[in-house]
Every structure is written in structure tokens, then in C-alpha cells.
Amino acid sequence: ARHVAAHGATGAGHQDRDGVWDDVEKGLARLRACREAIGGEVELLVDCHCRFDLPLAMRIAAAVRPLNLFWFEEPLPRDQIEANAHVTAHSGQTTAGGESFFGRAEFERYVTGRAVHILMPDVKHAGGITECRRIAHQAEIHQVHVAPHSPAGPVSTMAGVQVAATIPNFLILEWAFGE
């Protein structure tokens, strides 16, 4: 996280690549260390990779509240729309999700179910640039922001940039730094 911040990034993501959430206290300690490393000027984004159940998601959301996260991404499995909506409504966290969804219908269930604050269509999964623009329009109607997910290399990132440049509810572009 410190390396990303040192290169001028406005946000740094944290994800479980090595089972850090297998031990909740270890995961929380790592997030606290990330926040300390990047300070308060750089946003901290946390990707949970759909690994929690509702009680654990709510517990972790409460525990990380002092860290002032930019978003709390995909804490629950994607098919649990009502549970995701509960986290969105009651956790005090800004929630994000949808990086592996395909097509407007899947995104629409999340938007109308109020399952997230921020949709994250990925051009390579969602159905291309045009479909991502349609998804963003659908989200805008429901006052949901869009943060294109683009961590699969430069072509994917540039496709995400094209989407971002053409939608009024664009928030942030997620991309893999240094990969």
C-alpha cells in the first residue's frame, strides 16, 4: 500500500491473497497497518472476495469503521442480494460489487435490491464497453455510482477508461498497479 501511495495513487486496495481473513484479527491488523502506511490522504479500498457470512461481514464492517474505508467490496456471496442489501443499509460502510457479473439483468438485481452503493462492471465480464455503458445508465437511474473494474492488463484498463469517460455516474477506476 505504501508503494502505491508513494507513486501518487489516490487509493490503495487491499485483498485477501494469502488467507488473511482466515484469522479475523490478523486481517484487521493488516488493514490497520495499511491505513497507517498510507495515511489519511490516500483512500483505502477493501475487497473481501465474497468470503463472509452476514454476521461476520457486519462484525468486520464495524471493526474497520475507524479506518474510514473508501469501500467495503463484496463481503458476501453475490447471490445473497438481501443479505448484501442489509450490509449496505446497516453497516455504515460504502459497499461495492459486481466485478464478475455478466449483463444488465444481473446488475439490475443488485441495483433494484439496493445491494450496493457502487457497481463495478468489468468490461471483459459484463459484456463489453456498450453493455457497461448501459449498466451505468441503469445504475444512474437509481443514483448508484459506477467504478469500472479493470485489473487485467493495459487493454482492459483502457476499455475501462473508455467507459469511465462516457458515463455521468463514474466514481473511480480500479486497476492493478504494477502488474
Give the residues covered by each predicted segment.
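Metal-dependent enolase-superfamily TIM-barrel catalytic cores that perform enediolate-based chemistry
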Residues: 1-85, 90-91
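Shared catalytic-loop signature of beta/alpha-barrel
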Residues: 62, 68, 77-179
